[in-house]
């Protein structure tokens, strides 16, 4: 009986201890918010997690949605997916002890192999209904640039030393400041040199009761500008602020057999010729054009008596466009697009576009080298004419690429042997074969078949 009594006493003590421990767990007293910003130039989207639960994804030069949690402590994780692997790869983690009424931003920079996490902490901003101000912070996420001065003023005010709202090095963020709603121009210069302009925005109208982080990133292959600037609001939306000094460009491609040898003009009087003697499947250089509305006129080569195709493009500063002429006689068309040409380190990227007149929907297969497509599924199915397919993510390796008619297994084009490394971009257009209407061809603009 004595042994039983001692055992029961110990059990009771353990239970009381456990109850005491439960009652001492921290209790939330309020909320805090957090978002992550992707400043890894070579990354695709990463996932941002609280412990093991997804908060949301962030593409390069963008933020995740903001999320709000109790003021307790958490571990936040960054994960990416590498093509060819079966699970997400965790690349970084950060423990944060939340304080109530704080706003946290986690800047993820560096490389995928060696990421750096920088935590910015501020107060959660609230506004009264009658407030006429907005909150502005300025940050630095362009690793190739040194210290920068930030000027944020009325469009009529030129930058002058001493008027900067912030001077920042990479990874830093300014204190929050309240400004009256209105029109502003953001100018970024090298530190202590207001004439050495790194970036300048168009006039931007900012309304009251918003909270923004204005932040420069490294430029990418999708842009003609060396610096990208985003305004990230308090819910995590990223607003692009292009630099008007960097003009958009356009690359012209003739993908219509019937259009024939053509000249391309950018004025209705046909006096300003951009491209001359463009034949079927010719690809022009990337040509600068004005931002805004543009109209292009195609004529037979050296003959301005008739316009064979008139097509328009509304262009934004810094953007690299492509204009593909397609169709048959009497029904020519021009399709403008912005291919996602930015290489990423987690997969090879296939960018498919098709403009066939002889076939409708097509399927695209990418299979291991020397493998039949009979038992394979297409990586992209039902691609319609003049439709830019979603980028296809591929693993590294040696592959054969085929094009077939929709749901069919008979190759209309291919096999094309493509040897891929992570970061490669296969930029391709499915076209009609000039000398055989029964099959198709592929115009590779980058990442084409191995010689």
Regions found by a protein language model. Give the residues of each.
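Sec-dependent bacterial lipoprotein signal peptides
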Residues: 1-18
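Intrinsically disordered, low-complexity polar regions and short flexible loop motifs
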Residues: 19-451
């Amino acid at each position: 009986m004595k042994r039983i009594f001692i055992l029961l006493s110990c059990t009771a003590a353990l239970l009381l201890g456990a109850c005491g421990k439960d009652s001492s767990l921290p209790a939330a007293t309020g909320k805090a918010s957090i978002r992550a910003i992707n400043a890894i130039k070579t990354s695709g989207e990463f996932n941002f997690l609280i412990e093991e639960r997804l908060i949301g994804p962030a593409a390069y030069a963008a933020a995740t949605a903001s999320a709000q949690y109790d003021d307790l402590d958490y571990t936040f994780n960054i994960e990416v997916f590498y093509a060819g692997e079966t699970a997400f790869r965790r690349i970084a983690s950060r423990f944060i002890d939340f304080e109530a009424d704080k706003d946290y931003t986690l800047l993820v920079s560096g490389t995928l192999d060696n990421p750096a996490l920088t935590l910015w902490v501020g107060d959660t901003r609230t506004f009264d209904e009658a407030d006429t101000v907005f909150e502005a912070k300025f940050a630095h996420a362009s690793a190739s640039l040194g210290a920068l001065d930030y000027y944020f003023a009325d469009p009529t005010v030129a930058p002058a030393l001493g008027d900067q709202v912030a001077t920042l090095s990479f990874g830093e963020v300014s204190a929050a400041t309240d400004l009256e709603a209105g029109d502003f121009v953001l100018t970024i210069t090298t530190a202590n040199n207001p004439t050495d302009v790194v970036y300048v925005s168009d006039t931007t109208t900012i309304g009251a009761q918003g909270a923004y982080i204005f932040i420069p990133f490294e430029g990418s292959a999708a842009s003609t500008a060396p610096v990208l600037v985003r305004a990230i609001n308090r819910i995590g939306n990223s607003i692009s602020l292009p630099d008007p000094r960097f003009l958009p460009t356009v690359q012209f491609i003739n993908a219509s057999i019937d259009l024939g040898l053509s000249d391309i003009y950018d004025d209705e009087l046909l006096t300003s010729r951009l491209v001359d003697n463009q034949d079927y499947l010719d690809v022009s250089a990337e040509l600068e054009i004005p931002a805004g509305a543009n109209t292009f006129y195609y004529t037979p080569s050296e003959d301005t008596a008739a316009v064979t195709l008139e097509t328009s493009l509304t262009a934004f500063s810094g953007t690299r466009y492509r204009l593909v002429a397609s169709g048959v006689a009497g029904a020519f068309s021009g399709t403008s697009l912005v291919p996602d040409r930015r290489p990423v380190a987690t997969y090879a990227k296939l960018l498919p576009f098709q403009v066939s007149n002889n076939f409708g929907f097509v399927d695209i297969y990418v299979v291991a080298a020397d493998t039949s497509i009979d038992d394979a599924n297409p990586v992209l199915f039902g691609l319609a004419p003049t439709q830019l397919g979603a980028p296809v993510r591929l693993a590294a390796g040696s592959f054969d690429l085929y094009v077939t008619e929709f749901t069919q297994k008979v190759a209309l084009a291919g096999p094309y042997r493509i040897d891929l490394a992570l970061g490669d971009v296969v930029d391709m257009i499915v076209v009609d074969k000039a000398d055989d209407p029964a099959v198709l061809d592929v115009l590779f603009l980058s990442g084409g078949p191995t010689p």
